[in-house]
């Protein structure tokens, strides 16, 4: 891979100059413990791409758990896309998955005349009217990470959640065979994770195996999730498997497996997303696998879709984008552990990553 550098008289590359303008303040707001409602720093007037001069459009991301560490790579993706296209974004919503707080944030974006709004549609109907109001005001509204049938959002960027759940269920069938397994879910009913649980349940049913899947609510914060998972295992020591459909619960499963040496007892475990502790648990054998949904792309592509829609006058840009699923196991986890990058949210450093060897 060859990196082409654009130089200027001041010694900074054009990209570096733009990055310093666009990213200096934004990186601070990327802490998973930062409050919601934080804007990215103002981007440079000129975009990196070969685009006609355009206004510095501001896009608003409305999220359901704004301080959860899962979102760090998604926000890096949005930030990098903003630097590329000469736009800015604001991160707002709810810290604890409260739909009314998200609706308030969405309506504030509409009244503030945002240039585009992206919302995680975790509720089946709460955002129907707000989205229609945004569209009526000429503001493009798209969904990311979670989608809702019947909502008039213009497009969805994220994983096919039901199919990823079926893939999880198939792994459960392969690993467990029969018996009782736990399915941990942060917020039952919410559309960013409930479809995964439903997909897993369907796959287990289709297998015909004698496997009972218990759905266990863990809560919207990491500490709650770990506490409830540990408590569940204490009350169900004969469990055959422990699985989760969200990042925090997966992390909690890994910690519970390690604390009780459950892998040595033949208990299987797995879940979703690439939190550093989850990857470490896979490396140590406490988790069998995790499923990646590429949150960086969910942030990057969402900004890209809104930008192209704006710059084309609404003629182009809209696309249903599936950010895919990939199983990360002990056999392929090493590159994730040895590489620190914005793409996985493990580093804020901007750098080109290189690879070698055949692609499988």
Locate the predicted segments by residue:
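N-terminal secretory signal peptides
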Residues: 1-16, 28-40
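C-terminal segment of N-terminal export signals and the immediately downstream linker at the start
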Residues: 34-60
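Hinge/cleft segment of the Venus flytrap/periplasmic-binding protein
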Residues: 45-55, 192, 203-207, 301-360
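Hinge/beta->alpha junction and helix N-cap segments in small-molecule ligand-binding domains
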Residues: 62-75, 91-102, 123, 146, ...
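Short, hydrophobic alpha-helical segments
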Residues: 110, 172-177, 233, 302, ...
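Hydrophobic alpha-helical
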Residues: 119-135, 200, 214, 218-281
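Flexible loop/hinge segments that line or gate small-molecule binding clefts
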Residues: 124-163, 174, 180, 273-288, ...
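Exported/periplasmic ABC-transporter solute-binding proteins
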Residues: 240-241, 247, 254-297, 303-324, ...
């Amino acid at each position: 891979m060859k990196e082409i550098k654009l130089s200027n008289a001041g010694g900074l590359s054009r990209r570096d100059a733009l990055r310093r303008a666009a990213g200096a303040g934004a990186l601070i707001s990327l802490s998973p413990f930062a409050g919601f409602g934080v804007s990215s720093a103002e981007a440079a007037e000129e975009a990196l791409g070969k685009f006609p001069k355009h206004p510095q459009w501001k896009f608003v991301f409305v999220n359901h758990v704004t301080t959860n560490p899962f979102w760090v790579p998604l926000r890096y993706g949005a930030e990098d896309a903003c630097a590329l296209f000469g736009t800015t974004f604001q991160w707002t919503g709810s810290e604890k998955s409260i739909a009314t707080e998200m609706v308030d944030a969405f309506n504030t974006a509409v009244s503030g005349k945002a240039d585009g709004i992206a919302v995680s549609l975790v509720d089946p109907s709460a955002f129907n009217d707000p989205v229609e109001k945004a569209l009526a005001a000429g503001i493009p509204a798209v969904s990311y990470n979670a989608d809702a049938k019947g909502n008039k959002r213009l497009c969805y960027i994220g994983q096919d959640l039901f199919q990823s759940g079926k893939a999880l269920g198939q792994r459960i069938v392969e690993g467990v065979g029969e018996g009782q397994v736990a399915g941990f879910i942060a917020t039952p009913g919410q559309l960013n994770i409930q479809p995964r649980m439903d997909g897993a349940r369907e796959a287990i049913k289709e297998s015909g195996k004698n496997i009972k899947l218990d759905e266990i609510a863990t809560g919207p914060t990491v500490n709650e999730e770990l506490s409830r998972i540990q408590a569940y295992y204490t009350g169900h020591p004969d469990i055959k498997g422990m699985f989760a459909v969200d990042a925090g619960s997966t992390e909690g499963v890994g910690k519970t497996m390690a604390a009780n040496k459950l892998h040595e007892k033949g208990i299987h475990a797995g879940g979703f997303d690439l939190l550093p502790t989850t990857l470490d648990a896979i490396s140590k054998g406490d988790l069998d696998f995790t499923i990646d949904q590429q949150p960086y792309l969910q942030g990057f592509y969402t900004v890209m879709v809104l930008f192209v829609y704006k710059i084309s006058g609404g003629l182009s840009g809209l696309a249903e984008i599936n950010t895919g699923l990939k199983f990360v196991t002990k056999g392929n986890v090493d590159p994730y552990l040895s590489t620190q990058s914005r793409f996985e949210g493990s580093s804020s450093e901007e750098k080109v990553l290189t690879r070698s060897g055949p692609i499988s």
